[in-house]
Regions:
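Short hydrophobic alpha-helices at membrane interfaces in multi-pass membrane enzymes
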Residues: 264-288
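Hydrophobic, aromatic-rich transmembrane alpha-helices
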Residues: 309-310, 381-408
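Active-site lumenal/periplasmic loops and adjacent helix-entry segments of GT-C-fold
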Residues: 109-252, 508-511, 516-519
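Signature aromatic-anchored transmembrane alpha helix within multi-pass, membrane-resident enzymes
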Residues: 331-338, 401, 460-501
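Perimembrane helix-loop-helix junctions
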Residues: 301-332
Length: 647
């Protein structure tokens, strides 16, 4: 696969996002930047929703069920708008002029993030050599094989008994669509998704959220774009650690959901004029796909939107009328109860929440202020802008400024708690919904700090501009002012790249480089996998240690594997087969199990595992029941030929 294949996959993903998500957003009545930010959110909701509904309708996974759902929702929305428009005349709203500064604010971070993604990937078909990627790459293959992308189905790949009843599958469903529509490999389709989410969805949502809270000023948009590309805890960290692709998708959609919540609650500085019913529909379109991308993003929405909800409650309680106040209190209590219940329902099991503390309380606070989460190098520009935002909040004391500061405090508090709070029960109460895992909270913190940083930049720019005499400003030609503004925007984005970003790119890049000593799949092992489709029949199942990377024969070579992930449900047959592979000897029971599961080939990728040395299958080379078919370096492919001799 070439870079042209990757560019084509990116183009296809952008096209279907614009056509499907954009058309529905247009039908709902969104325009301009709101339309641009809504398109990927609506596309995610429509795609993930269609994936759940399609099996009930007897439809296999493809663009067809997605298109059907989009036409239904868009058509009904457009029809309602026409009928309502005829019955109730609306006050015409003057159309907004094209804002060149928004375009610049989006183009600069998009270009920088594309560049950073390409640096990290290194090659169009590279893939992250990390533990979680075994599941994510194989999950896409499972969607393609079963023609089912439902979040109620993906868990069956590793838990055939149904014990994993729900696994957020929005990411895997979209990547599968890319494979279907373009014919590229799963790694190339995954990389196309990485680029679109990181350089497209994220900066658009970030700029929209900042403008919604801090106002539609050019400096707000420019600063938001610079910060979006300048704090590597999101999105780069989630490309490095894990990898956490589904959470990255969900958090990239989070700013739009927050902006919708702010607009719907009536505490926005800048938002479209929509009736309550349309706001509710837009909110549903925002949170559906985000939640099915990763529930952790929805819990983050609950946490970061709390200041807005409290502001609305306070405003309502100040109004006269005991009935209004009683309804407000009842609604707020219902909100709290629902939030607590959702936190418990969406919380992962206790065994998955055991991540340890990593910093002292003082160091954690300094890390949060410096924006140096995980990489321990300050994000200088963002840190300065946040401090300016705090200062201007204390000076201006406007409602919107307090909301941005409150959002920042919540994000910082969650991060400090997860890395430093030495009270286990209290720590788990606050951050257990995100596995008590520092990288997840660091990524959420970036969303929380971004509006305040943009506000700090814009308010400082306004103050500095006011210091320039009016006659001096008037003497500057318009073209010169625009050129100076563009230069300042480029400079800010460039300065935001100083500090943490280069280290983050360096660390993340190492996980995408395939070498002779790669943690998951070495260059020799990959070479053997590329020949697998010529040597292993489609009907056969391949056994191998998933910790050594053998499980990726499923995603990379399109051959079924006995263990598609390291954390797979082990039944009696799998247990017997794995035990036989460890010993290099298949008894009658193990042979029966192998025959029942169609296991006819074995990959031996040695004792180098993704998390360090593993036991491996050391006895395979001496087994009379296995015949060597192919080898590349230390990687070997065997055929199980001697089971008829057992028993």
């Amino acid at each position: 696969m070439t870079w042209l294949d990757l560019i084509g996959a990116v183009g296809v993903l952008l096209a279907i996002t614009a056509v499907i998500g954009g058309a529905v957003a247009w039908a709902v009545g969104l325009r301009g930047l709101w339309l641009l930010a809504a398109a990927p959110a609506f596309f995610a909701t429509i795609t993930a929703g269609a994936a759940v509904v399609a099996p009930w309708l007897g439809l296999g996974w493809s663009l067809l069920p997605v298109a059907i759902v989009a036409v239904l929702i868009g058509g009904v929305s457009a029809a309602i708008r026409v009928v309502v428009g005829r019955r109730r005349p609306r006050t015409p709203v003057p159309p907004r002029r094209f804002d060149i500064w928004v375009l610049i604010a989006l183009a600069l971070p998009a270009a920088v993030l594309v560049w950073r993604c390409v640096e990290i990937l290194g090659a169009p078909g590279s893939f992250s050599q990390t533990f979680d990627n075994i599941f994510h790459l194989n999950g896409v293959r499972y969607v393609l094989d079963t023609a089912n992308a439902s979040s109620l189905h993906l868990g069956f790949m590793t838990s055939p008994s149904g014990s994993l009843a729900f696994y957020p599958a929005a990411w895997h469903g979209v990547v599968a669509l890319i494979v279907q529509l373009t014919g590229v490999t799963i790694p190339v389709a995954t990389n196309a998704m990485i680029i679109v989410v990181s350089a497209g969805i994220w900066p658009v949502g970030a700029v929209l959220l900042a403008r919604t809270l801090a106002g539609a000023r050019p400096a707000v948009a420019i600063a938001a774009g610079a910060v979006a590309a300048g704090v590597p805890a999101f999105p780069i960290l989630l490309l490095d650690y894990g990898v956490l692709y589904p959470l990255m998708y969900g958090l990239a959609l989070l700013p739009f959901a927050l902006a919708v919540g702010v607009g719907m609650l009536g505490v926005a500085k800048d938002s479209p004029h929509l009736d309550a019913g349309w706001w509710i529909l837009v909110f549903a379109g925002a949170i559906g796909g985000m939640t099915l991308a990763h529930p952790g993003a929805f819990v983050a929405l609950l946490a970061l939107s709390a200041p807005m909800v409290c502001a609305v409650v306070v405003r309502a309680l100040r109004r006269r009328g005991w009935r209004r106040r009683a309804l407000t209190i009842a609604g707020f209590l219902s909100y709290l109860v629902a939030g607590v219940l959702l936190l418990k329902v969406l919380r992962p099991p206790l065994g998955a929440r055991g991540w340890p503390l990593s910093q002292s309380m003082g160091d954690a606070v300094l890390t949060a202020l410096a924006g140096s989460m995980w990489y321990q190098v300050p994000a200088y520009a963002a840190a300065v802008l946040v401090i300016l935002g705090i200062v201007w909040t204390l000076i201006d004391r406007t409602r919107e400024a307090w909301l941005m500061l409150a959002m920042y405090v919540i994000g910082a508090w969650l991060y400090v708690v997860v890395v430093a709070l030495p009270i286990p029960n209290l720590r788990d109460a606050f951050t257990g919904s995100w596995y008590n895992n520092a990288p997840r909270l660091a990524a959420i913190f970036v969303v929380a700090l971004l509006p305040l940083a943009a506000y700090g930049a814009a308010r400082t720019w306004t103050w500095l501009r006011a210091r320039i005499p009016a006659d001096t400003r008037q003497r500057v030609p318009r073209g010169g002012a625009i050129a100076a503004g563009v230069a300042a925007a480029v400079a800010l984005v460039a300065v935001a790249q100083i500090g943490a970003v280069p280290r983050a790119v360096e660390w993340a890049s190492s996980t995408y480089r395939m070498t002779a000593e790669s943690a998951l799949v070495s260059s020799d092992e990959y070479a053997l996998l590329t020949r697998l489709d010529e040597e292993v029949p489609e009907s056969a199942v391949v056994a191998g240690d998933p910790f050594a990377g053998a499980a990726l024969a499923y995603a990379l070579a399109d051959r079924r594997v006995l263990l598609p992930h390291a954390l797979v449900e082990m039944d009696d047959a799998r247990t017997r087969i794995v035990a036989a592979l460890r010993e290099g000897r298949f008894d009658a029971a193990a042979c029966r199990a192998a025959n029942e599961d169609d296991v006819r080939y074995v990959l031996d990728f040695g004792t180098a595992g993704v998390h360090g040395p593993i036991e491996g299958y050391s006895g395979l080379g001496d087994s009379s029941q296995l015949t060597l078919i192919d080898e590349q370096g230390d990687a070997r492919l065997y055929e199980l030929t001697g089971c008829s001799l057992a028993g």
